Amino acid sequence: MTAMKKRMILATLSSLLLCMAACSNKQLPTSEDILTEARAVKTLNAYDEMNCVVYDMKVTPASPKSSIDRFVSDDCVEGAGSFEIRYSFSGNSSEAESVYIQQSGGDYRSDLSFHPLGLSIWVKGNKNNKGTFRFMIIQDAGMFTQGTLHDKGRWQFFEYVDKEVLTQEEWTRVVMPYEAFTFVKGHDMGDNKLMLNRFEGYRIEVTNDEGVMCTGSFCIDNLEQLTSYAPEFKGTPKFSSVFIQLDGVYENTDWDKEFKASQEVGIDTWIIQYAEGFNDRAEEKTSFYVPTKLPWVTKQYDIMNRMFEAAKQNGMKLIVGLYPGDYSKKDTASPEQYDFLVERNKQVFDELFALWGNHPCLDGWYITEEFHDGSYPVGWQQEPSLSMLANYLQTVAAYIKSKSPKEVCIAPALWRGMPADLCGEWFGKIFAQTPDIDVLYLQDIGGRCLVDFDVDLPNWFAGIKKACDANGVIFGVDIESFKECWCPKITMRTKPWSELEEQLRVAGMFTDHITNFSWATFKPGTDTYEGYKRYIEGK
């Protein structure tokens, strides 16, 4: 948090008194109480970019002559901008007119149940504005039910009301304790309680309670999830391995030099992401080892051969990835692609095992196909896709184990496609069917501007580790040392060490099996490598 922001918090905290709970005389926490207790904070929306998120912006059926629009303004509390919301009411309706902007869930979702305190949003209005500001939490108590993963008919809306903030001409921080939200509309379950781990999205709604014809505008910025969570870091966690993604550019690499640099920072194990590479634009199917008799390979490199030679000379260990396949992007419940991948992986494994199955530096095997817990473009969130994925993983792992005693690893991506508790249960259902999978290296997706390190990661890590522990799988983390984001647009680059250190310390609270993707953004000369070197030296 910047010094400027801290000053603004002190200067502009809303003095609005919170209402008493409808069902008791218990005093709700004040804004000051919550901010004093808040520790780890996640930005849910910075409102800096117009097109990073898909929004619903609508008028309600009773407001056919009303309007709402949004723009990016350079008047902001933090970051590069804020959203300016402009609205109008006709004043000619038999019911209260209403307009709203809404963001609903999907992948990379938030889970408000993690050490919950409340939400916070900055608002800047105009003294002439008419209308009431209503912030609504949308929840789906039955989300991810088999057959109906998502159903808007189940949505419930719980609102927090501020009748003054739209007329405040200075930036005002509206702090909203969860206890102050009340059920207002949607699916009525009788006992309508806020379930913070079934958060589907939110709506900012303005209602024309006075029934007058008017126009108005206000700005919103920096919607935050406030938690009481303070990470308890353990010692000095270290990387146990590092990934390398092979390519033809490594044809003449001095592996003695690379391995010595790796050992200089205490990393003695490398994971070769895959033994082959496909460049579909050139229609070139590449093998990174020789010899190969696989009919689809058109070009061969001896890169892995030289890596194994150098590994033996330098006391390094190698975990070897197999066929670089991918799952169906259209139908994960169809057996054809799984069957194809099984056969390709068996053939690649057989060649690799013949070359290095008894090599002293071979430390394990890696099934390369990356799955995720999300839904885009298709996923494995429900049956039969879930069990078909598990069966595929087990089939390949069992084939490996029939010939090699070495550990079998996988590295799916954490897309946060489900709430943390359901995500943990989902992984548990997979691992219950994959007894020959030994190690999970969970991609933290920390290089893609899609995750909060100290709110999202501890929550999901805990649930998934529980599933691993229950099924005899080692929980590990695959930390991304690169930075490449779609929104905001950031081209592929190495990240600052300070960011990587936070990821490493968070992972270290849950495991000592911590790998790093990848050597290309962690090699000598990068800020990540040099910073890590100082870190392990205690400097």
Language-model regions: role of each:
Residues 41-43, 48-49, 227-276, 414:
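Boundary/entry segment of secreted carbohydrate-active catalytic domains
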Residues 299-314, 334-364, 429-433, 503-510:
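An active-site-proximal structural segment forming one wall of the substrate-binding cleft
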Residues 363, 442-453, 470-539:
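Substrate-binding cleft of secreted/luminal carbohydrate-active enzymes
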Residues 27-235:
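Beta-rich carbohydrate-recognition modules and glycan-binding surfaces
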Residues 324-325, 348-383, 515:
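Active-site groove signature of glycoside hydrolases
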Residues 255-264, 268-326, 385-410, 454-459, ...:
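Aromatic-lined substrate-binding rim segments of carbohydrate-active enzymes
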Residues 19-22:
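C-terminal motif of bacterial Sec signal peptides marking the signal peptidase cleavage site
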Residues 319-331, 363-370, 392-424, 442-443, ...:
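Aromatic-lined carbohydrate-recognition surfaces of secreted/lumenal glycan-active proteins
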